[in-house]
């Protein structure tokens, strides 16, 4: 695996998520109207971890949901006719709330655009914010994250891979060189 380079360790991921949790609290003047919504698949455990960090320092549990954007993607035809659709589960009404979308990597912005469309079908939030663990640049759409764990400039031939304990058995972020197939 010589084409892999670790850019975040487990402890660095933990610290980034705790910092993001504090920033969400500070920017919103409290958490009473905040809902975290993880974009499937790795955004969901990240949203859960941010909620756990908030519970640790605020003593309150922020609602956490999960959002499947499969049917909202503009590249659905490229992924083939058998695209698997997962459950969207947002445990509270989002109308009038601050929804913080959570994802692992911000790249072109197309995933976030699809998530915005999906959220619009669920209600009318007062505002929507975006939290990402990694922002790697190369935007194709005018989208910017409100909360970023780490900015990682990359080339288009590189791929950022987030591995999480919940899905991969280990916490780390690596860059794979010369293997971008997104």
UniProtKB/Swiss-Prot annotation:
Chain positions of motif PRPP-binding: 99-111
GO biological process: regulation of DNA-templated transcription
Keyword Transferase: yes
GO MF annotation: an example: uracil phosphoribosyltransferase activity
Pfam families, sorted: Pribosyltran
E.C. code: 2.4.2.9
Keywords recorded for this protein, A-Z: Glycosyltransferase, Transcription, Transcription regulation, Transferase
Protein's UniProt keywords contain Translocase: no
SUPFAM superfamilies linked to this entry: PRTase-like
InterPro entries (alphabetical): PRibTrfase_dom, PRTase-like, PyrR, PyrR_bifunctional
Chain's role: Regulates the transcription of the pyrimidine nucleotide (pyr) operon in response to exogenous pyrimidines. Also displays a weak uracil phosphoribosyltransferase activity which is not physiologically significant.
Family: Belongs to the purine/pyrimidine phosphoribosyltransferase family. PyrR subfamily.
PANTHER family: BIFUNCTIONAL PROTEIN PYRR
Alphabetical list of HAMAP family matching this protein: PyrR
Name listed for the protein in its UniProt record: Bifunctional protein PyrR
């Amino acid at each position: 695996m010589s084409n892999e380079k670790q850019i975040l360790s487990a402890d660095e991921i933990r610290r980034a998520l705790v910092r993001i949790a504090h920033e969400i609290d500070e920017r919103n003047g409290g958490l009473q109207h905040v809902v975290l919504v993880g974009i499937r698949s790795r955004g969901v455990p990240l949203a859960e971890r941010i909620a756990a960090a908030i519970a640790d320092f605020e003593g309150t549990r922020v609602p956490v949901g999960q959002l499947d954007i499969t049917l909202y993607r503009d590249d659905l035809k490229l992924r083939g006719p058998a695209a698997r659709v997962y459950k969207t589960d947002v445990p509270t009404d989002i109308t009038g709330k601050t929804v913080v979308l959570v994802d692992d990597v911000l790249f072109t912005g197309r995933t976030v655009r699809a998530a915005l469309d999906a959220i619009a079908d669920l209600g009318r939030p007062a505002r929507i914010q975006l939290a990402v663990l990694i922002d790697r640049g190369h935007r194709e759409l005018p989208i910017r994250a409100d909360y970023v764990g780490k900015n990682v400039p990359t080339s288009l031939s590189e791929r950022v891979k987030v591995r999480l304990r919940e899905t991969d058995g280990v916490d780390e972020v690596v860059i794979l060189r010369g293997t971008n197939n997104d």
